[in-house]
Amino acid sequence: MKVGVIMGGISSEREISLKSGKSIVDSINKNKYEVVSIVIDEKEDIINKVKGIDFALLALHGQFGEDGTVQSVLQTLEIPYSGCGPLSSSMCMDKDISKCILKAANIRTAPWINLRRNDKINYEKIEGMGYPVVVKPTHGGSSVATFIIKEEKDIKNAVTEAFKWDSEVIIEKFIKGDEITCPVFGDKMLPVVAIKPKAEFFDFTAKYADGGSDEFVTELPKELHEEVEEMALATYKALKCEVYSRVDMIVTEDKVPYILEVNTLPGMTPNSLIPKSAAGVNISFSELIDMIIDESIKVIR
């Protein structure tokens, strides 16, 4: 089978995507697959460069990659691909839509408001949520242009900066606690990974720089583990995810978990969280790639 590892793209996460793609190409079982690297530099490449491949292994992140656009093109071209379909990809990429769905499904997530470019900032609603709040692009990823704001006077500048990256901005209550990530593969949760950033929160540098944070498989207390697992699987189902996704949460000091967001194409760099989780149950990176391909092929699109 000829597998095209699709990487690069046109989003702010291009460099991370290239790292993910290279890691996959380096680690994939070349005795089992004929592997080609496909670097996307412009949108047309997703049509022109995929000719002749039997399967698209997606290592794209951010817009035009993780938002369902590429998945729709590949489906139109009848090329099987890895991970979630167009609908779940686009819903998870839109933090406002995904939080609306979680709220409707009675899955705990922080209070928020969403702004379009011409909307007035509703300071009363923000005050009602209570400071600090997090300001970030609604469709962004990797914590690009994400700010923790502690006072009303700093809101406007943060919103202005976030709008440089997106047409919508989300402002949500900052939940203080420990960040964990819960990879879900099919209908099962892989081991929980704890994230201990060395900065104030898990920002771009902490995510992708060596030593930016400590990340390790962790064993939660039984009751908390059961609640986290139930929430992760319910979130995966509510957002119609397929094959695999990474559900990120914050757990407060009182052991109350909140859903942060869902990543449908999580990073696959040497620092990435899903390979660390899989290693916790003795699944190598190469085996994980195999599993993703095998499960993706089974999905009827």
Curated annotation (Swiss-Prot):
Molecular-function annotations in GO: ATP binding; D-alanine-D-alanine ligase activity; metal ion binding
Keyword Cell wall biogenesis/degradation set for record: yes
Keywords: ATP-binding, Cell shape, Cell wall biogenesis/degradation, Cytoplasm, Ligase, Magnesium, Manganese, Metal-binding, Nucleotide-binding, Peptidoglycan synthesis
The record's free-text note on cofactor binding: Binds 2 magnesium or manganese ions per subunit.
Pfam families on file: Dala_Dala_lig_C (PF07478), Dala_Dala_lig_N (PF01820)
Localization: Cytoplasm
Binding site for Mg(2+) 1: D248, E261
Principal cellular location given in the protein's record: cytoplasm
Cofactor (UniProt): Mg(2+); Mn(2+)
Protein name: D-alanine--D-alanine ligase
Gene this chain is encoded by: ddl
